[in-house]
């Protein structure tokens, strides 16, 4: 009798247990584990690969807690890296070039500011040189998500005026972007999010400023996106020092470049900016104003 009850119990419970396991697997598959569970917690992540992109730019790949983890960073947000360097805590913001479509790792493309290369900054960049010195297997602390802007898809941006304010929703048909140097990383994040959705009609216009042609970060990725999605992504460069047979603009961002290569004010686009503060203050904002782009439709990362 006991054996019969045991068998009966097994027969009754097996389908339930099977269904439970199936539901759990489906749930786990649809909701990957998130690394950045709280913006107030630091998460140590291990360096697993370092790629030399050019003379001063590197791609750093860090492992997430498991191959099934995603970073958990909303589009438009950034992370902070923190490390103790020469006895002092150094914290710097960065935007990954990978996304939550990538499981198990996060990629950062970072320009290394070496000492004794820029007369105004003889010590170079503390964090970028620290990253350059890291060996495979070393860890560094990540914290996030952080930032005032989130792209929600289909042209919808949620923007907070400050950290304590509720977000204001702006829905646009086109986005104008001005990036300088490493300021390209948040732009690429938004561009990729828009283009990967075939039902997102938003058009991106990027004006990308650099010192020289060789300083153009992520150029292959940008031009591949432009070539494959020419109706949805417009790309233009300007460099301070142009080589011979240069097909793009030369000089600082100016009114003419904004008129020619960003969407007009009549389209009511959102204008995104990221780059050195002097570029934003003296080149972008005054010339955007001259062209007619209102301040409430301009956002600087």
From Swiss-Prot:
Which Pfam families does this entry report, sorted A to Z? Answer: FAD_binding_6, NAD_binding_1
Q: Which UniProt keywords apply?
A: Acetylation, Cholesterol biosynthesis, Cholesterol metabolism, Endoplasmic reticulum, FAD, Flavoprotein, Lipid biosynthesis, Lipid metabolism, Lipoprotein, Membrane, Mitochondrion, Mitochondrion outer membrane, Myristate, NAD, Oxidoreductase, Phosphoprotein, Steroid biosynthesis, Steroid metabolism, Sterol biosynthesis, Sterol metabolism
Ranges where the FAD-binding FR-type domain occurs: 40-152
The UniProt entry lists membrane topology as: Lipid-anchor
What Enzyme Commission number(s) appear in the record?
Answer: 1.6.2.2
Q: Which residues carry this modification: N6-acetyllysine?
A: 42, 50, 120
Q: Which Gene3D superfamilies match?
A: Nucleotide-binding domain of ferredoxin-NADP reductase (FNR) module, Translation factors
Task: List required co-factors.
Answer: FAD
Q: Where is the lipid attached (N-myristoyl glycine)?
A: 2
Entry-annotated residues carrying Phosphotyrosine: 43
The highest taxon in the source lineage is Eukaryota
Which GO cellular component does the record give, naming just one? lipid droplet
Q: Which GO terms describe its biological process?
A: cholesterol biosynthetic process; nitric oxide biosynthetic process
Q: What does this protein do?
A: Catalyzes the reduction of two molecules of cytochrome b5 using NADH as the electron donor.
Q: Which family does it belong to?
A: Belongs to the flavoprotein pyridine nucleotide cytochrome reductase family.
Q: How does it assemble?
A: Component of a complex composed of cytochrome b5, NADH-cytochrome b5 reductase (CYB5R3) and MTARC2. Interacts with MTLN; the interaction is required to maintain cellular lipid composition and leads to stimulation of mitochondrial respiratory complex I activity.
Protein's name according to its UniProt entry:
NADH-cytochrome b5 reductase 3
């Amino acid at each position: 009798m006991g054996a019969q009850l045991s068998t009966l119990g097994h027969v009754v419970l097996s389908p339930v247990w099977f269904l439970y396991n199936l539901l759990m697997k489906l749930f786990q598959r649809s909701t990957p584990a998130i690394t950045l569970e709280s913006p107030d917690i630091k998460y140590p992540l291990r360096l697993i690969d370092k790629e030399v992109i050019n003379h001063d730019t590197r791609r750093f790949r860090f492992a997430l807690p498991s191959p099934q983890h995603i970073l958990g960073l909303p589009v438009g947000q950034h992370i902070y890296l923190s490390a103790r360097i020469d006895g002092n805590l150094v914290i710097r913001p960065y935007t990954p070039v990978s996304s939550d479509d990538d499981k198990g790792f996060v990629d950062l493309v970072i320009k290394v500011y070496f000492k004794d290369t820029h007369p105004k900054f003889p010590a170079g960049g503390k964090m970028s040189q620290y990253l350059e010195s890291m060996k495979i297997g070393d860890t560094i602390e990540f914290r996030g998500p952080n930032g005032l802007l989130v792209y929600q898809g289909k042209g919808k941006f949620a923007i907070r005026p400050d950290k304590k304010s509720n977000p204001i929703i702006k829905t646009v048909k086109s986005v104008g972007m001005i990036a300088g140097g490493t300021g390209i990383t948040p732009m690429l994040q938004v561009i990729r999010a828009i283009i990967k959705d075939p039902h997102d009609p938003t058009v991106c216009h990027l004006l990308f400023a650099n010192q020289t042609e060789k300083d153009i970060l992520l150029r292959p990725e940008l031009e591949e996106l432009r070539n494959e999605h020419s109706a949805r992504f417009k790309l233009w460069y300007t460099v301070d020092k142009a080589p011979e047979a240069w097909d793009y603009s030369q000089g600082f961002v100016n009114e003419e470049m904004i008129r020619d290569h960003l969407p007009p004010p009549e389209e009511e686009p959102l204008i995104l900016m990221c780059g050195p503060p002097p570029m934003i203050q003296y080149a972008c904002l005054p010339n955007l104003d001259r062209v007619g782009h209102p301040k409430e439709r301009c956002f600087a990362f």
